Amino acid sequence: MGIRYLLVLVLVLLVLGCEVQGAHMPQQDEATTSSLFTQMQESFYGYWGIAKSAAQGLYEKTYLTTMDEKIREIYNKSTAAVSTYAGIFTDQLLSMLKGDQ
């Protein structure tokens, strides 16, 4: 289960990293005939678009709302516990610093 999320994370980061670099704008060649390089380049960008849409579909398919709710619940419980223990620690520290008066 962890490997699947790691794979999704890597794919999403790869897509985001490539999107940050900017969209590819094909340049107008002076020659009317396309060379082998431009054909390979167009083919690569076509495959890249398919892979990008597949990664996005995989991410949307694996996004679980129940997992999101569980994470929010755990966060709320942990912050409540931390604030409670921080209050207890502060009270103990103040009573130690004040001493018996």
Curated annotation (Swiss-Prot):
Posttranslational mods: Proapolipoprotein C-II is synthesized as a sialic acid containing glycoprotein which is subsequently desialylated prior to its proteolytic processing.
GO cellular component, one term: chylomicron
UniProt keywords, alphabetically: Chylomicron, Glycoprotein, HDL, LDL, Lipid degradation, Lipid metabolism, Lipid transport, Lipoprotein, Secreted, Sialic acid, Signal, Transport, VLDL
Subcellular location: Secreted
Region spans: Lipoprotein lipase cofactor: 78-101
Region (Lipid binding): 66-74
GO BP term, example: positive regulation of phospholipid catabolic process
InterPro entries: Apo-CII, ApoC-II_dom_sf
Pfam families: Apo-CII
MF (Gene Ontology): phospholipase activator activity; phospholipase binding
Location, primary (coarse class): secreted
Signal peptide range: 1-22
UniProt-listed PANTHER family: APOLIPOPROTEIN C-II (PTHR16566:SF0)
Family: Belongs to the apolipoprotein C2 family.
Function: Component of chylomicrons, very low-density lipoproteins (VLDL), low-density lipoproteins (LDL), and high-density lipoproteins (HDL) in plasma. Plays an important role in lipoprotein metabolism as an activator of lipoprotein lipase. Both proapolipoprotein C-II and apolipoprotein C-II can activate lipoprotein lipase.
Protein name stated in the entry: Apolipoprotein C-II
